[in-house]
């Protein structure tokens, strides 16, 4: 009990010292779209924690190559607004080779397509009528359909996967997931791989559809929940239409 009381007092003391920032101030500081900041309603403590994360990232940028660029870290927030979200695809962290663009699994157009994304296209080609794999990994047009492509860790050092796992980005990503779960209705969450599946506790499965499978990476072999054959894209659209929402046009990547 004494430890619990100390922790509560410590949090309260820390909150008292936290800065109360307006949405515009948060936008300037974090580079996150204002609509998302208004939706999230970050607490003073969360803002303080995020400022610490940004300091750690900036320290690394001073002497290391960090992906994606500062301008693209929160591209997800500008390409898919909270009111438009219908499907959430959870990723881990950006590609450590510089192909990432601020969207989970997506790349900039000029880069080659990563193996995980090739497998995603393979599952789409297998299950979605008339889907043809595009010649690049840009997934921006999915965002306009209401697909939120969200990594749980937003930055990475070149060549070092998960290098920023301990920085505290989860303060933001977990808040996004839990807030969407609470505030929105009838969303589809696609959790691919152990890292994403561990976040299922943040989602209310009574009101949302949660689909899980192995990670799409060809390096992952899972007899119990293989990615190829999961039918997640078809099942997502069935759920959306059953709940009065327009299905995702997965084929828009080629339009």
Swiss-Prot record:
Excises uracil residues from the DNA which can arise as a result of misincorporation of dUMP residues by DNA polymerase or deamination of cytosines. Therefore may reduce deleterious uracil incorporation into the viral genome, particularly in terminally differentiated cells which lack DNA repair enzymes. One of its GO terms (biological process) is base-excision repair, AP site formation via deaminated base removal. Belongs to the uracil-DNA glycosylase (UDG) superfamily. UNG family. It catalyses: Hydrolyzes single-stranded DNA or mismatched double-stranded DNA and polynucleotides, releasing free uracil. NCBIfam families: PRK05254.1-1, PRK05254.1-5, ung. GO terms for molecular function: uracil DNA N-glycosylase activity. One of its GO terms (cellular component) is host cell nucleus. Coiled coil: none annotated. It is an enzyme of class 3 (hydrolase). It is found in: Host nucleus. This is Uracil-DNA glycosylase. Keywords: DNA damage, DNA repair, Host nucleus, Hydrolase.
